[in-house]
Amino acid sequence: EVVSFDNYSTGYKENKQKGCTYINIDIREGFTDWIEEFDVIFHLAALARIQPSINKPSETIRNNFDSTLNVLEYANKKNIPVIYAGSSSKHHGLYGSPYAWSKYGGEELCKLYSEVYGLSTTICRFYNVYGPHHIRSGTYATVVGIFENQYLNDEPLTIVGDGEQRRDFTHIDDIVDGLVRCVGRDYKGEIFELGSGVNYSIKDV
């Protein structure tokens, strides 16, 4: 059984899948005891993307840090392992954006709860995830989503810079596979990079 908690600040309700129970909740407000216990928590919620975090640093940091703290507090109370979505953005500089810092802070919180309280936490970093339901337009759109949207609308593909920027692009199915492989391992703050290990330039894409 899968239960999803989401406030839909960046997600879409039309992306709902069969076999999953959806609860509209803002995890910054914490969890209540009426919530049933779980075998594992995948903490994937965050205000993502670099540019929006630069425009709204306080909102991004408070949202991402406080929500992670609430998840860890609840998990520690119920002794539920947590698998946390860290960020590959810190590799571009920890202080390069409020988003990168907030996700790094979340990683450190996971390590803290493992070290001090013995909570099982696993940190997984994603690399440019794409798939059927990625966002195609707006502030939170990914580069693959933007290209796809422009292609479908018979528009020229927009390249910023010389197009030689190289990235590791990872399909969502591979991300899910990596996350599932971490279940039941009883890790204590270990970090895993989930990617293909092969990079492509924006021109290649």
Kindly label every feature range from the protein language model.
Residues 1-129, 173, 179, 203:
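N-terminal Rossmann-like NAD(P)+-binding domain of SDR-like oxidoreductases, especially those catalyzing
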Residues 104, 129-145, 153-156, 160, ...:
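Glycine/proline-rich active-site loop of Rossmann-fold NAD(P)-dependent oxidoreductases
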Residues 123, 169, 199:
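Short aromatic/basic micro-patch
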Residues 18-19, 87, 139, 143, ...:
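Activation loop
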Residues 113, 147, 151:
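Short amphipathic helix/loop within the catalytic HATPase_c
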Residues 55, 59, 96, 134-135, ...:
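Short capping/connector residues at structural and topological boundaries
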Residues 34, 94, 136-139, 143, ...:
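Residues at alpha-helix caps and immediate loop-helix transition turns in enzyme cores, especially N-
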